Structures are given as C-alpha cells and as structure tokens.
Design a protein with these regions (language model features):
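Anion-binding and metal-coordination hotspots
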Residues: 1-335
Length: 335
C-alpha cells in the first residue's frame, strides 16, 4: 500500500527524490520491561526451583506429610514450579541463541581488526599503535535478558533518559514532499547496521521512483563501510562523521576547507561536510525526518505498538507510515 501511495504521488508530480533523510525512533513495545528475565537471574531462580521441587518430592514420600503440612497442595505446588522451570528453560534457550549470533558477529569484526593490523604491520614493518584487540568472550552475560511477554522486543535507551522495552522504527523521508519512502523495524538499539537495508529498499524502488541524489543521516549511521556503500549505490552521502559542537565559533560557519583531502569515501565525506554547501544541506536533515516522527507520536498519537513479535510490529509500522503518507498527500494536493 505504501508503494501505491508513492506511485500516486509520483504520477501527480508531488514526489521527487532529491535529498532524503534517514533516522530511527524508539517506540514502546506491547510489553513491560519488568517482565524481562536476565540470564543470571534465570540461572539462580532455576537452581532454587529445582531444590524446591526435590524438597516437595521428598515430602510427598513422607507418610505424615499431611499432618506436618496442613493445607499444602503438593501436586499443585509441584506443577507450579515445574511450569516455571519450563518457561525459564525456554527463556535461556532464546538468550543463548542470541548470544551465539552476537558471538559470530563479534568474531567476524575481531578477525577483520586483526587482519587490518597485520596488514599494516606487514606494510610498515612496525607494530600498529594501540593494544591488540581482544577476542570476544563466549557464553551469555549475566545481564543478557529476554522479555517473557514479547521476546522479540529489546531493552533500549530512550531519548528522555532511562531505558524501556521497545523497538527501533526506521524511516527514510523525502525532502520536499516529506513522504516516507522506506520503513522498517529493527531490534537493534543503535542505527549503524540499518543503513545497508535502507539502500537495498531504495534500490528496489528505483524503477518506480528513481534514485535519490543525496542521503542524509546522523552520526549513529556513520562507519567507513556505510559511507562506501552509499557511494557505491550512486548516492552522495551526508552522514555526520562525529558529534558537532552546539556552539562553534561564528567564523567556523564561513570557513572554506582546503582542497586537499583523503581520497577515500570517508575522507570525501568529511571534506564535503566542511563546505558551506555541504553544511547547509546537512542542516536540512532534522527538518525533514524529525517532524514526521514528532507528528506521528504527538498528533497521530502513535507511541506504542499494539501487536507483539517483530513480523507483526513491522506490519504495524508500515500501516502507520501509510497513514502518514495518505495524510501528507492530502495536504500536498491542497497546495
């Protein structure tokens, strides 16, 4: 449905992909963070419940247990603990599966870092600066947890401070029309791995909507591989390479960078962001995508998912973005 609305906007000459802005926003899951179970607590509780089950079984074998435990329904007490043990075992399996995925990712990153350091050592004949990277640790950490109400949701930091059970909803918005071009939901609290999936979505939309000229995103999306991926897609990246100062000296706004620059994707990006044109274009980012999130939350009242599970939440976010696009299209037609 989103595609149909975008196609309609394109046919009405209300949508043109020039500058697009990508960002993410945390939305509450339909689950309480107090229903989360950590691996450390699950292990301790599992041991406690097993000990209680053994004790209840011994009591059941004692001839005078009714006299010593008046009112105690041993079969019910046993079943209650065994049910909890089954839930704990299932939760630990989920945590351990996630840990294996985490370990595989960290191991791949570790091997890349080691390979880069070895290549530099072979090229220069000197040891690279800094300490050698540490290999990732195996096994779940005590703080690794799963939510028993919505296992797909994650504990995430919120913009107002603190943490909540949430999903990270992503959207790419076109500058002039402010229509949502791509939308997806992720379980990752940070955004750095969300740019490549967006590029894949934009690539699939090219036959219908064309290709954006420029993609703007904040520093959460910045990595050398991401910048290179945007360039490879034929799009100019405008991704903050670091946090900017809130109150720079006034003269910095009018400085022109030197012509020399590092001839790499990240080097070209840093040079571009120092130019007057680059800074002016990047400044548009927060006026493109952030108002969309603000209106969705404050005006449309969507702050929390009603459904549970990543697949269903994805569909719900698509529906919200569709509602925004229909609303926005009505405004554009009236201009």
């Amino acid at each position: 449905m989103i595609l149909q609305v975008l196609h309609m906007a394109r046919e009405m000459k209300l949508l043109k992909l020039g500058l697009v802005a990508l960002d993410g926003t945390k939305l509450h899951a339909n689950a309480s963070r107090h229903k989360a179970l950590s691996h450390g607590y699950a292990t301790r509780l599992e041991a406690q419940l097993r000990a209680e089950v053994d004790e209840l079984l011994r009591l059941a074998e004692t001839a005078d247990q009714k006299e010593r435990h008046l009112g105690a329904d041993l079969p019910a007490e046993l079943k209650r603990r065994q049910d909890r043990l089954e839930k704990i075992a299932a939760a630990k399996i989920v945590i351990e599966e996630r840990d294996r995925e985490r370990l595989a990712q960290e191991q791949a990153e570790y091997e890349k870092m080691v390979a880069r350091r070895e290549a530099k050592r072979a090229r220069t004949g000197k040891s690279p600066r800094g300490r050698d990277p540490k290999p990732p640790e195996e096994g779940p950490r005590p703080t690794d947890q799963v939510n028993l109400t919505d296992p797909d949701s994650r504990i995430m930091p919120t913009s107002g401070g603190g943490f909540d059970q949430a999903y990270n909803a992503q959207a790419t918005v076109a500058e002039r029309s402010m229509l949502v071009i791509t939308a997806h939901v992720t379980q990752a609290p940070n955004d750095v791995k969300q740019l490549v999936p967006v590029l894949e979505q934009l690539k699939a939309l090219e036959p219908l909507l064309g290709r954006p000229d420029t993609l703007a995103a904040d520093t959460g999306y910045c990595s050398a591989s991401n910048v290179e991926a945007v360039e490879t897609a034929g799009i100019t990246p405008l991704i903050a390479a670091g946090r900017t100062r809130h109150h720079p000296h006034w003269s910095e706004r009018f400085e022109t960078p030197e012509e020399t620059m590092e001839d790499t994707p990240i080097g070209r990006l840093k040079h571009r962001l120092k130019t007057l044109a680059g800074r002016a274009q990047y400044a548009k980012r927060k006026h493109i995508v952030e108002p969309v999130f603000g209106i969705i939350k404050r005006v449309m009242g969507f702050r929390q998912f009603s459904l549970r599970g990543l697949d269903l939440v994805e569909g719900e976010w698509d529906l919200v973005c569709l509602a925004w696009n229909v609303r926005r299209l009505a405004v554009l037609r009236g201009k």
